[in-house]
Amino acid sequence: MKRNLLFILLLCVSLHHPKAQTGNNNYVKTTVPTVATTATSGLSVSNSITSYQYFDDLGRPWQTVQVGMNPSQLDLVTYQEYDAAGRSSAFWLPVNAASGNNGNPLSLSTVQSRSQLSSNYGDGKAYSKPVYEASPLDRVLEQYGPGQEWHNNGKRVKTEYLSNTADGELSCRWYRTTDTRGNVQVSIQSGKVYYPAGELYVTRTTDEEGTGISLEFKDKQGHLLLTRRKNGVIYHDTYYVYDSYGNLRAVLPPLAVDALAAAGTWTVATDGTGVLAQYAYLYKYDDRNRCIWKKLPGADWIRYEYDRGDRMIASQDGEQAAKSPALCTFYLYDIDNRPVIQGTCEFRGSIASLGSTAMLTSLKRSYDGKIIASGLENSGYNPNMTLYFPVVHTINYYDDYGFRSLTGFDNESYFPKESHLAGGLLTGTVTTLLDGSGKKLYTAYYYDEKGRPEKTVSSNHLGGYDITTTVYTFTGKPKTVTHVHTAMGKTQQTQVYTLSLIHI
């Protein structure tokens, strides 16, 4: 038995202090060429990015070495310590290794001495470190930031795990919510103003100075019920109220909480102080738990409708409802559930009737694939329901460039033919300016053979075009980005951005 214990202790010591030779450590080497190549043997730091990730005998990552990564082409080393229980302990900020390191791991003492150099941090405690509670839960009680000023002076973020009480700092009001004739009702029952003691989980966090205190209260289902911020002796509370299905029904910020402190029942209509209307966030749901009404502070209700496919098909805010005739915003989709048209139309009766079917559109094409100018504003899209006096705001096209036959895209000097397939990608948009002019802006998106954005051509409100062209490196990073801007009667402006690593 003693031999077994001795063996285990020796094993723990060996795992806690990994050896400093690459050949004696488990590692994964990753090399990413930055130029086209058929082999990695001849690559250097000038044309590749190489890193080593080292693992201890338990398979835990304890060090990462990025070869030649800093501007002086020195290795950049990140070190992770573990405590005796195998938990993450000190996590060191990256340090520069000495010249000629060649991807080898550093010992802890070397990392510490390198951190003290002025070329790194000039600090022997350049690491963050958690302090765990003495329990199998391994919860973090304290968190130190990098730097000896934090560690030597006990400056850390402190976390306490508590339960609520019936009064005092750890108390939580018991708000309830119901729907009454379409109104969201918030109430506190007489005799049940606060949650009973021990019903809620409370997490108290104190900042490094010991003055910034915040508390979070959660129920047994994990719902956040209260966030409490303490400013001196004053508490600022924000309450979150849920229904029996777990849907968020109300958010009460501090000014609303201060006014709704005693037992009572409130709705937007009956709240004589106007607190709910002015400060609260309120939500209503249908029998499928979809948000159908939303109220933001100081604003009127916003209404949402969905089709049988759970897609939002219409919305109406307070300003639209107040117009004569009333308006609503509609949303149309294609057969692949992609948004294709958004706009406004007259609101007649109930927009709920729109949800009785799936809001789809069909796209009319000629035999050669070109889109036929028909449907909503000659976009080619034909919805499967009646929209009264629709005004289209945005139109989206996907998969191909059949829309180039439509008005606005027929200038081949700026809108060239496609050069690669674009299946599943956004290829064109039409946007209507909302300044009352009715003018439209046209945009086409072009992609390379790998599906990366290669060229974007957009008409602008100045009677010209904006063209953005991107050239990629071998690794898929932007190498050059060229932006050309033209306007009617103005000189063409060209901007070229060149992006590169410092020494690659």
Language-model region placement:
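Bacterial Sec-dependent N-terminal signal peptides
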Residues: M1-G23
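Beta-strand elements of repeat-based all-beta scaffolds
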Residues: L5, A20-L501
